[in-house]
Amino acid sequence: MPNIEELKQRQEKIRNFSIIAHIDHGKSTLADRILEKTETVSSREMQAQLLDSMDLERERGITIKLNAIELNYKAKDGETYIFHLIDTPGHVDFTYEVSRSLAACEGAILVVDAAQGIEAQTLANVYLALDNDLEILPVINKIDLPAADPERVRTEIEDVIGLDASEAVLASAKAGIGIEEILEQIVEKVPAPQGDVEAPLQALIFDSVYDAYRGVILQVRVVNGMVKTGDKIQMMSNGKTFDVTEVGIFTPKAVGRDYLATGDVGYVAASIKTVADTRVGDTVTLADNPAAEPLHGYKQMNPMVFAGLYPIESNKYNDLREALEKLQLNDASLQFEPETSQALGFGFRCGFLGLLHMDVIQERLEREFNIDLIMTAPSVVYHVNTTDGEMLEVSNPSEFPDPTRIDAIEEPYVKAQIMVPQEYVGAVMELAQRKRGDFETMEYIDDNRVNVIYQIPLAEIVFDFFDKLKSSTRGYASFDYELSEYRRSQLVKMDILLNGDKVDALSFIVHREFAYERGKLIVDKLKKIIPRQQFEVPIQAAIGQKIVARTDIKALRKNVLAKCYGGDVSRKRKLLEKQKAGKKRMKAIGSVEVPQEAFLSVLSMDEDEK
């Protein structure tokens, strides 16, 4: 065990940093190069996007989870420094993950694509880094691209963000250019962690994973004090205590250590069996010498998008609950509560940060836990003011009060920043208007790129705004949004009736102006998707008691006259009457099978299909 002096000297050599960038600006590739350069990973083990360990991340080419890795780097001054690289996601839905990783760092490498320049999410993440008082090192990446224009990007960084980019490293992570300069800048510019080894332990939990054998494994950043195997630790939020069975670091693989001291980033295993005992953002301290107060944690993220998740096989309900609990462990922004639906049985109402987050959770449940799911249309949290003066928060359309009790409905608006090349500004404005957006302002970033700011209802963004934006700008637009306010809107709840029965899972909220078109579109779409039954099935869209659209699925009929060669007409009529009576009886008691696509079709309602 090293003495206090040695620990303090070691602390001087620690550098904690993360890499922030917009999607596809080369963040994961740069992380790969840094791992190679510091010989953390042998070339035999190297694979592209090494830190994106989830299959999903590699397939989509995005980073979803944060990862923390320890590297040793021998600098030009002859000293060996300990780097902790904390990898962060770049997508708008995972801003929460970014804020968590930045809270564990003292510096951030800002990667900007030399051809594309600054994008909306680059800005969003830089502001997060500035909030955390991080030292920001700009890196202009992909300088080997034919379209690269590093000098333009340099002035952009200075003008738009206001950072001094005179010493920005010009690099190409793919070709391995400029990596050493980046590492030297980390040594020189990123401050060593502050904190006192002799103070009581304070460690911030910034992530956790569940291991079937060792229980919950916490990923922590030690801010003060130290922790070693055999210590008794205590969670500061709920006072529960655990015995530490193992501490260690990640060099992508987990490697056991004797202790973690101030400034270290690593993991702690303490046979924590119940998932609910640990919360990301909580502070760990020692039970026999606790810290006076917890660390400043993270702000709790509120979900913006809600959807129902139902197991296709109803006996998988408990498996789904366990799976959601395990996912919640290292994704603290996921929230869920049980709900039932007449159409779909038992399931959960889940809250997500955005659509990509929802998509990723659904896919992780299906892949990692083998649960087949039906997902209902996503909705947002509405504020419903009733006639007797109550204000209800409703996220599930089927829980809306009776229309006669509603005085007014308010819906959330977001402030959307859309960065786009000049020639597409018209297309973006048209899309935003169509989505009921209110124009706020427009700023020119350089000669060619414009930042357009709109106030748009979140419910309109939830559907397919992002895909539409990408297709109307050939993929050049980038987009970031934050919740701004609630506003009164003319909203109504639309129910879909099959064979006269409401299907609660197909209900949705729509603006009165678009109600008729939306209703017509959905009934036509359902007609194509729901298979024909033995009896005629009417599909209706209704607002309250008023039917606004209807279509019928024609019945299948068996040719009952086939075995009746020639024969009397009354014989034929008798067979047809018998069939008719059978169909009538069937219709009275028959239920309609609704395939999964029907629920999804409500989501992908496309104005362009009109």
UniProtKB/Swiss-Prot annotation:
GTP binds at residues 24-29, 141-144. It holds the Pfam family GTP_EFTU_D2. NCBIfam families: lepA, small_GTP. One of its GO terms (cellular component) is plasma membrane. It catalyses: GTP + H2O = GDP + phosphate + H(+). CDD domains: EF4_II (cd03699), EF4_III (cd16260), LepA (cd01890), lepA_C (cd03709). Residues 12-194 form the tr-type G domain. This is Elongation factor 4. Keywords: Cell membrane, GTP-binding, Hydrolase, Membrane, Nucleotide-binding, Protein biosynthesis. Required for accurate and efficient protein synthesis under certain stress conditions. May act as a fidelity factor of the translation reaction, by catalyzing a one-codon backward translocation of tRNAs on improperly translocated ribosomes. Back-translocation proceeds from a post-translocation (POST) complex to a pre-translocation (PRE) complex, thus giving elongation factor G a second chance to translocate the tRNAs correctly. Binds to ribosomes in a GTP-dependent manner.
